């Protein structure tokens, strides 16, 4: 991963397999390095741009060589500082809001529909009243889901109606003959 980083330089001498890279070797040759966190792959750094530029400027100046032990603890110290900074931010940036008290409900159903008790109910025309009134068998309109086969004289069975008409005609004819 660190092969393509711009700020890293590789040492000119290859390290021996048995040699430990201690502070003595760093004293011989200063090497610019950037700390890379393994948790995020080096993509997002928690340091700000100001801190990075300040460290880069101080790294350019000849100073005492840094010890490797600092690098070992740098990752752990960054995470602890980050965690404490988060807890401070959460505690200080969240002001306590007063609990809003609910207003007592004064609305009733009539108020919700803007119905005034003083106003008179709407007058219906007599035609509409007559259509809505149920007169029984003589209901003028056959409307609704249960009004199949309902005529002006109520529910009718055509077969029975035909039989009644035949009997009445026969009765009339029989009476006329007498």
UniProtKB/Swiss-Prot annotation:
Modification sites for Phosphoserine: 53, 77, 87, 119, 147
Bias-annotated ranges (Basic and acidic residues): 1-15, 160-178
Residues that span the membrane, as ranges: none
Entry comment on modification after translation: Ubiquitinated; mediated by UHRF2 and leading to its subsequent proteasomal degradation. N-terminally acetylated in a HYPK-dependent manner by the NatA acetyltransferase complex which is composed of NAA10 and NAA15.
Any one cellular-component term (Gene Ontology): nucleus
Region (Disordered): 1-84, 134-178
Domain of life of the native organism: Eukaryota
Residue positions, PTM Phosphothreonine: 139
List of residues that carry N-acetylalanine: 2
Polar residues bias (residue ranges): 139-149
One biological process term in Gene Ontology: protein ubiquitination
Keywords carried by this UniProt record: Acetylation, Cell cycle, Nucleus, Phosphoprotein, Ubl conjugation
Modified residue annotations for N6-acetyllysine: 64, 150, 152
Regions of compositional bias (Low complexity) in chain numbering: 37-47
Chief localization: nucleus
Location in the cell: Nucleus
Subunit field text: Interacts with UHRF2/NIRF.
Role of this protein: May be involved in cell cycle regulation.
Name assigned to this protein: PEST proteolytic signal-containing nuclear protein
Gene this chain is encoded by: PCNP
């Amino acid at each position: 991963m660190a092969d393509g980083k711009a700020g890293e330089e590789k040492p000119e001498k290859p390290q021996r397999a048995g040699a430990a890279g201690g502070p003595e070797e760093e004293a011989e040759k200063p090497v610019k390095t950037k700390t890379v966190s393994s948790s995020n792959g080096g993509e997002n750094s928690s340091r700000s741009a100001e801190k990075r530029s300040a460290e880069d400027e101080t790294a350019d100046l000849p100073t005492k060589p840094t010890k490797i032990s600092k690098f070992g603890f740098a990752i752990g110290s960054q995470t602890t500082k980050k965690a404490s900074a988060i807890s401070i931010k959460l505690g200080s940036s969240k002001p306590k809001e007063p609990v809003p008290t609910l207003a007592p409900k004064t609305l009733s159903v009539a108020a919700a529909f803007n119905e005034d008790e003083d106003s008179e109910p709407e007058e219906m025309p007599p035609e509409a009243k007559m259509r809505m009134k149920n007169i029984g068998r003589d209901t003028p309109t056959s409307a609704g889901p249960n009004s199949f086969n309902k005529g002006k004289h109520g529910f009718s069975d055509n077969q029975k109606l035909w039989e009644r008409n035949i009997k009445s005609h026969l009765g009339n004819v029989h009476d006329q003959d007498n």
